[in-house]
Amino acid sequence: MSENCTHNCNTCGESCGSRTAEQTSFLEPLIPASSVKKVIGVVSGKGGVGKSLVTAMMAVKMNSKGKHTAILDADITGPSIPKAFGLNDNNVMMTNDNLMIPATSALGIDIMSANLLLDNDTDPVIWRGPVIAGAVKQFWNETLWEDVDYMFVDMPPGTGDVPLTVFQSLPVNGIIIVTSPQELVSMIVAKAVKMAQKMNVPILGLV
């Protein structure tokens, strides 16, 4: 912190030590046995634009390059990643320390999703925002992520509790924004872009 700090962050640059410390103070640590090198968020302002498909395709691509790849499905109430990889419900094992072991696809991609915890993949998840945000944190720090090179986080549409939780609690290296050319969609996606900018999360690309 500068000796001339006025404690008014509105007048402070993004490189300020005080502001940087504030941004990292909410990060949730991984368990010691876990290791994740890069975290890439996949977001969209509006649903139905192919966000989960893009997430799956990027994970498969990085996996084909020899990288150990994982997907954290943060779309708790509308998860589709397990189905995309042919995984069934109740596919998550537990360690002796009560840590979740992610399911592994036929390609070797580690996946953690709410649908993998349900008895039936059509059962609804009827939770309020804080509970959903808590589940996302658990998927991050109560799951055994072993030697992951790239983790893709499939987030729900919008700028609500889950994107905020991911941006604050996970060490996100950047995001991919998925959109479609309609004017209405573009307006909503602009909100996601501004949210990322306000939280100093790099935008890596637009699909």
Map each language-model feature to its residues:
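Cysteine-cluster motifs in flexible loop/terminal segments that predominantly coordinate metals
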Residues: M1-P29
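Switch II (G3) loop of P-loop NTPases
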Residues: N90-T95, A114-P130, A135-T165
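Phosphate-binding loop that captures ATP/GTP phosphates
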Residues: H68-T69, A74-L118, A133
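Walker A/P-loop phosphate-binding motif and the immediately C-terminal alpha-helix
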Residues: K38-I76, V193
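Residue-level signature of catalytic and energy-coupling elements of molecular machines
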Residues: V36, G47, D73, I81, ...
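Conserved catalytic-core segment of NTP-binding enzymes
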Residues: E142, D149-V207
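Amphipathic alpha-helical transducer elements in NTP-driven molecular machines
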Residues: A33, G78, G129-K137, G160, ...
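Phosphate-binding P-loop
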Residues: I31-K37
